[in-house]
């Protein structure tokens, strides 16, 4: 990324872009609370990350880089990890505070799902550090735990009438999914959690995209105009702010990584809010970066297995997946890849909101 006079989308420009957009939103929705929540959340995350990553470093909670990854990443070894703590703990505290003022089963469900995935991510990171290699929980163990939590969340959400088979496309258009809504919810929760986790492979990529997506989700919820859902819009803006504050120290070159503690949980929180607010259609658009990252891995693995079975030698579609590594091996600088992914994500937010308003 160029330094000096540049049009690059840096951390500072991304921050002010979101702030300006939030000011516009505050004017449109007549609520200064929106901008206040975002700024306060950003400041909280910024401060606790600034001092927290030093504590994590002293505790030797350091990242192990997988040997199969790009060789350029080997110099990231021993970077403090598990920084997602500084995003998720304030978020959980916020939910507890909100629950004191808002009598909503949905807030409790969101808290349950967030803290459960947080525990999975924390355990995965801890085992990875303890084993001194980039391998914590086994993939089948992690998926089983995620699936169990997702099923419990869906059952309780359904019993509390938060799951509606009529997926809202726009204010005037609903799509009846019938019982298919349940696997959709499962894929949204588990799939998005793992998709954000896969995206967290470059400095600032997952944190920046998460900040943008939560911003878009918050805006979509406000556009719905349902008073009982407004609180989830405010919560989404708060999470966007928390991710931005963390991004200050996670951007290239990263002083701290969020780890699975952060990425798995952020994806789960994003999926949970989308389920509780019936925001599937918009989520599918604004989460395009996360979905693309996950699909690139699925395509790569499937194509390799099929070609190996047919030709006795597996072939690859991409140089390496997730797809951000493909661009790295193409010779594009890490910070440039992240910058371009942020830009694409912002365009997806605009597209999602425009479609929401005009369909």
From Swiss-Prot:
Pathway annotation: Cell wall biogenesis; peptidoglycan biosynthesis
PROSITE patterns: MRAY_1, MRAY_2
CDD domains: GT_MraY (cd06852)
Transmembrane stretches, start-end: 7-27, 28-48, 82-102, 103-123, 147-167, 179-199, 203-223, 229-249, 256-276, 337-357
Catalytic activity: UDP-N-acetyl-alpha-D-muramoyl-L-alanyl-gamma-D-glutamyl-meso-2,6-diaminopimeloyl-D-alanyl-D-alanine + di-trans,octa-cis-undecaprenyl phosphate = di-trans,octa-cis-undecaprenyl diphospho-N-acetyl-alpha-D-muramoyl-L-alanyl-D-glutamyl-meso-2,6-diaminopimeloyl-D-alanyl-D-alanine + UMP
Gene Ontology CC annotation, any one: plasma membrane
Cofactor requirement: Mg(2+)
Coiled coil region boundaries: none
Entry EC number(s): 2.7.8.13
NCBIfam families: mraY
Role summary: Catalyzes the initial step of the lipid cycle reactions in the biosynthesis of the cell wall peptidoglycan: transfers peptidoglycan precursor phospho-MurNAc-pentapeptide from UDP-MurNAc-pentapeptide onto the lipid carrier undecaprenyl phosphate, yielding undecaprenyl-pyrophosphoryl-MurNAc-pentapeptide, known as lipid I.
The family this protein is said to belong to: Belongs to the glycosyltransferase 4 family. MraY subfamily.
Identification of the protein by name: Phospho-N-acetylmuramoyl-pentapeptide-transferase
Organism: Prochlorococcus marinus subsp. pastoris (strain CCMP1986 / NIES-2087 / MED4)
């Amino acid at each position: 990324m160029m330094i000096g006079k540049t049009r690059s989308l840096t951390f500072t420009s991304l921050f002010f872009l979101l702030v300006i957009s939030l000011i516009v939103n505050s004017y449109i929705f007549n609520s200064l609370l929106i901008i206040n929540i975002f700024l306060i959340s950003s400041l909280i995350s910024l401060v606790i990350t600034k001092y927290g990553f030093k504590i994590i470093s002293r505790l030797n909670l350091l990242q192990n880089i997988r040997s199969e990854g790009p060789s350029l990443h080997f110099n990231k070894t021993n970077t403090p990890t598990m920084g997602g703590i500084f995003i998720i703990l304030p978020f959980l505290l916020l939910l507890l505070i909100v629950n004191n003022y808002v009598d909503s089963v949905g807030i409790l469900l969101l808290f349950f799902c967030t803290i459960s995935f947080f525990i999975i991510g924390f355990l995965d990171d801890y085992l990875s550090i303890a084993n001194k290699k980039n391998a914590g929980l086994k993939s089948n163990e992690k998926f089983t735990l995620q699936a169990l939590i997702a099923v419990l969340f869906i059952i309780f959400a359904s019993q509390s009438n938060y799951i509606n088979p009529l997926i809202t496309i726009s204010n005037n258009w609903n799509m009846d999914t019938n019982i298919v809504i349940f696997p959709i919810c499962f894929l949204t929760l588990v799939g998005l959690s793992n998709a954000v986790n896969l995206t967290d492979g470059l400095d600032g990529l997952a944190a920046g995209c998460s900040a943008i997506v939560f911003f878009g989700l918050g805006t979509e919820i406000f556009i719905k105009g349902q008073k009982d859902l407004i609180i989830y819009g405010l919560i989404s803006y708060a999470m966007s702010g928390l991710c931005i504050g963390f991004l200050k120290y996670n951007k290239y070159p990263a002083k701290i990584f969020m780890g699975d503690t952060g990425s798995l949980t952020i994806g789960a929180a994003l999926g949970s809010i989308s389920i509780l607010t019936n925001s599937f259609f918009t989520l599918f658009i604004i989460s395009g970066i996360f979905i693309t990252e996950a699909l690139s891995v699925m395509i790569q693995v499937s194509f390799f297995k099929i070609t190996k079975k047919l030709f006795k030698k597996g072939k690859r579609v991409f140089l390496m997946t997730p797809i951000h590594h493909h661009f790295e091996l193409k010779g594009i600088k890490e910070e440039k890849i992240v910058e371009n992914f942020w830009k694409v994500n912002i365009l997806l937010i605009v597209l999602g909101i425009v479609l929401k308003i005009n369909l």
